[in-house]
Design a protein with these regions (language model features):
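A SIS-like phosphosugar-recognition module
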Residues: 1-107
Length: 107
């Protein structure tokens, strides 16, 4: 299963140009904090309909906590649990790293 990340505003310059056809196997997860910059939020508001048009869905996850540290740790924690849950649904060992070990051995 392919997974990648990008950040605003950088994805508006590079990633977004590739969103040209519908991919029903793609789901967009967005992570937000109460500290998000207002221009970044505006960029997201403009991009969300594009994500919806070319993917099977968009899931917004907003951090809990009061400080930046609490919110960042919350998002890291929930992101890890999401990864483990999806791996379990697909019958994949979430800690197996054979391909990485192979790469390291070849280098």
């Amino acid at each position: 299963m392919l997974c990648w990340h990008h950040t605003f505003p950088e994805m508006n310059h590079n990633e977004l140009v590739g969103w040209t056809e519908k991919n029903d196997s793609l789901v967009v997860l967005t992570f937000h904090t109460s500290f998000d910059y207002k221009r970044t939020l505006k960029r997201y508001e403009v991009c969300k309909p594009i994500f919806q048009k070319f993917s099977s869905g968009v899931i917004d996850i907003t951090a809990k906590g009061e400080s930046k540290l609490e919110q960042f740790l919350y998002l890291i924690h929930i992101g890890d649990w999401i990864s483990c849950y999806i791996a379990d649904l697909k019958g994949i060992d979430p800690v197996e790293v054979n391909v990485i070990n192979h790469l390291k051995s070849e280098l």
